[in-house]
Amino acid sequence: MRKYAECAAIKLDSFGDWTAFVLTERGRPDIAPTVKHLPHKAARLLHHLRQRGASVPLCTSPWDRDRIHRATLRGSHQSAKADIDFVCQEMLEFCEQGFWTVLPLSIALRLPHLRLSPLGVVPQRNRRPRLIVDYTYSGVNDDTVKLAPPEAMQFGKALQRLLSRIVRANPRYGPVYLGKIDIADGFYRIGLQPRDIPRLGVILPTTQGEPLVALPLALPMGWVESPPYFTSVTETACDLLNARLRHWQEVPPHPLEDLAATPPTAVASPPGKWMPDTPAFGDSAPLHSPPLAYGDVYVDDFIMAAQTRRHRRRVLRAALHSIDQVIRPLAADDRPSRKDPVSVKKLRQGDAFWATQKTILGWDLDTRAGTLTLPPHRLSRLYELLDAFPATRKRAPLAEWYQLLGELRSMAAALPGARGLFSTLQDVLKRKANSRVRLSRRVFDSLTDFRAIADSLRNRPTRFRELIPVGDPIAVGACDASQRGMGGVWFAAGLPPLVWRSEFPPAIQRSLVTSDNRTGTISISDLELAGTIAHKDVLAHALPCVAERPIWLAGDNRASLAWATKGSATSTTARAYLLRLNALHQRRFRYVPQHDYIAGKANVMADDASRRWDLSDAALLTHFNSSYPQDSLWTLQPLPNAMRSAVIGSLSRQRSIPASLRIDTTPLPVPGGSGNGSAPPSASARICTTSRATTFPFSCSSRNGTDPAPLPLATSPFDLARWRTPSVTWRRRSPGWGPRTLA
């Protein structure tokens, strides 16, 4: 490495110009020369990146020699110092490929705007470690003026978009097949503007001699603007891919097409025993819809989904050609170290081979069974995380706690019921001291719940339709809570209109925070959240099957709706216990809840159910039949005693859970499977849930255009549907997103 740095210094002196030196070392741009002619809004940005590179504007003054000296003395992270041989070997390969260059510190100091950040080494599973720069520690990330288009980063919902396409695929054309294509060398495909490169300098670990400085010639790992700049390229390619598929363009063969058909060395086994004989997606797509042909991308991982053999071939060809449109393929005059844009190594490993069982974005997907599970290595990692926090442990470093929360959050989608267990774990961060957190009994109770969920995963994988709402809700309702009690109404096909209510015990009523009782321990929002949970339990026991079906409910308390939707709140109060109860209830019954706000003045039916305690049960039914008449008479549905006890216990901060909701390893039946459960209601049995007005309508005839029109009272399912936010399919920003700035 030192010999290379000395040669690079000599070459720089011979050029006498930093820009000429960079362009020579980097070679031809990887972005295709024809990008400016692409039928896409981002064409101008990509052409700019090809011609000039990504800029690195900073909002602070250049570093002086003293600060550079302090950064040099500080050096790299311990992870890099502990593996100097690997760092030198890896950096030397990067220099040969034109991604980095290395200079002695004395030469690098001549470059204007030089800054030095520490280098780290991150281990990776089944791959060699990765070099990453800590630009946050040096302040470069905070000082960077954000010019890259943030709307290019669509990868946050890639999994939801893919699952949404799968569950809505037309079953007439068979199961959905999946494939992957990886971009080789990732961020290093996008060059930097030569004059800005010294701002991203890196101090390398050395054992002796003059310190060495590494300078990135392309987007480095760790810089805050690298993801949006790079995804502006890959997302454009993905848009071109889907445009080809939408317009039914004929796609010619691709040179890598045969290599992409290489089967994997090991065929994945079914992720669990819970597998129906036939797909359970029978009513999720119109019978006239064409076979699925879709592509998406997560940073540099292209995901392909298709049904028939013909469409699988079209999607594969379209993906390969679309990538070539934005990242030029290999040319005869390229340097020997340059790789094809598509990772040939991954193709040989079978990544692009079409299969119904595939590891996608760190999840094992089975499109025949319609399930999502944690791969074995991630499940082992989950146990490793939990084992690191035995009940005898009293404190933990803050960094370790953040790592635990981050990894548990990343696994929560495949852990049914896990979303409601984060409230206590997050609350620990509010009480941190001296970069350490204190671990309490409540924390270990939550970790025990996580372990119980992990133990049940073999027989309890997550169904796609537990995550993606499909079709109209099978029931609509509204609920409310007051100091005296809680109640609500439900409308569902095949059932009479239901009203329910339950009175809070005096101890709960006395604990409510009011203007006269400021020392209370329960807020009205907590009671509203309790009512929401009880409301769903009433429906779950009234209908024969709610599994994997959307249900819609409205409430007039925004805080409780937000907690129920998110699944957690940073707290150890009653709401933490309620959210745990809410998550385990959804885990048990597997419905897909949709929560919406309704104005308090319009929520009259739920108000009466929760407040009219001057009426007996019979008088309440008479009141509803006369005030809110429906096609059939109202029925008073009781709240099961087990749920009432659990709600009161949670409000009292007790971990009381009904036996039916406890985490076990018993396989659950599959709706629509081979006799293992009740079939979901047919499309013809759905109730009308079409939204006929906006959530907050304004009067067109009012003297002031901002004056709200009088809110209509919600006295029927049609009135409630006015407040429903329509559920739409997760979609990409197609046919194209456009940057707000040039670069």
Predicted regions and their residues:
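A conserved non-catalytic segment of reverse transcriptases
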Residues: 122-123, 212-217, 296-297, 327-415, ...
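Reverse-transcribing Pol proteins
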Residues: 1-151, 416-450, 726
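RNase H-like nuclease fold core
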Residues: 468-524, 538, 544
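Catalytic-core region of right-hand nucleic acid polymerases
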Residues: 79-82, 86, 91-241, 245, ...
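RNase H catalytic domain
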Residues: 306, 536-604
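Catalytic palm subdomain of template-directed nucleic-acid polymerases
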Residues: 139-149, 190-191, 257-335, 366-372, ...
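Charge-rich, intrinsically disordered N-terminal extensions
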Residues: 674-743
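A short, polar/acidic, helix/strand-boundary loop motif
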Residues: 210-233, 494-530, 559-576
